Amino acid sequence: ALAVRRPDFNEVAVAQIQDKYSSYPSNGLTPQRLASIFKEADAGDIMRQAELFEEMEEKDPHLFSQLQTRKNAVTGLDYEVIPFDSDDERDKEIAEFVESELNSIESFEDVMLDLLDAIGKGIAVSEIMWGFEDGRTMVNDIRCRHQKRFFWDDEDDFRVRTRDAPEGILLPESKFIVHRYKARSGHPARAGVLRVVAWCYLFKNYDLKDWVSFCEVFGMPLRLGKYAQGASEADKKALMEALVQIGTDAAGIIPDGTEIEFKNSDKTSTTDLYERLARYC
């Protein structure tokens, strides 16, 4: 009889404290930084790209909604395990066993949701926690593993960083579920939906920041302070503080010999430019 090799019963990608931390690459994101993150991913190191994609989902509610719709379309489907040969008793027995194992997982829908993270990021990985009972190898649990724990080496082999091997090891056979989603052809590091929309996300980020700044001052006159020639640094500082105070409290005091002038902003300019750009992105 052919000997069947048992899977690894040990936990390989043990959760580590640094897994929950991020370098928050979206903070101060620029075209140069985004290009640098993508170059790292193209070379096999997807850590910063995975962190960026995670932030993009958190910060853009429309983007999150679109990805969630795709995921829910899958998790909402019914499923069944069909035997390879419906006339073969052994095949039917195997199918029934597999289905019972899936049903025994506390929340198989969460397992699917974790693996569907590949839609945005191009790849998602979960580790199978194997057990042995009554002479059978069983699935005790399926645990999501963060994408930043994985990378491609110089030979383009997929590896996982572990506590004992931070330099990475090849994935043990029958130990990990790797979902590679292809929004487009090419390497998995470049195949996720978020890779395609990242540039628009960056430009939208710039636009929203400028739009918020614009909204803060739109319709408000420019507050121009004038100080007398020979005014001291203390007088200049007091005048500036008064200008700021007027902006928030609509009242203020200034030293004698100084003046505040209000200049109305030009309202003839187009005010929907920011909204049009945000909608495009």
Language-model segments: what does each one mean?
Residues 2-64, 68-74, 81-257:
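Structured, contiguous alpha/beta core segments that scaffold functional sites
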Residues 239, 280-281:
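Generic structural signal for hydrophobic residues
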